[in-house]
Amino acid sequence: MSKRTYQPNKRKHAKTHGFRARMATKKGRLVLASRRAKGRKQLTVSDK
């Protein structure tokens, strides 16, 4: 039996998918722009 692949970790999740991580790259900023355009209430995982 293999182990479960999803091992939740809040810090790693925020470091990878958080607001500052999105702002750090051009593509990340594009993600934020499209989520804003769509009207998402939560832009990133750090907006709890």
UniProtKB/Swiss-Prot annotation:
GO terms for cellular component: ribonucleoprotein complex; ribosome. PROSITE patterns: RIBOSOMAL_L34 (PS00784). It comes from Mycoplasmopsis pulmonis (strain UAB CTIP). The keyword Ribonucleoprotein applies. Keywords: Ribonucleoprotein, Ribosomal protein. Belongs to the bacterial ribosomal protein bL34 family. This is Large ribosomal subunit protein bL34. InterPro entries: Ribosomal_bL34, Ribosomal_bL34_CS.
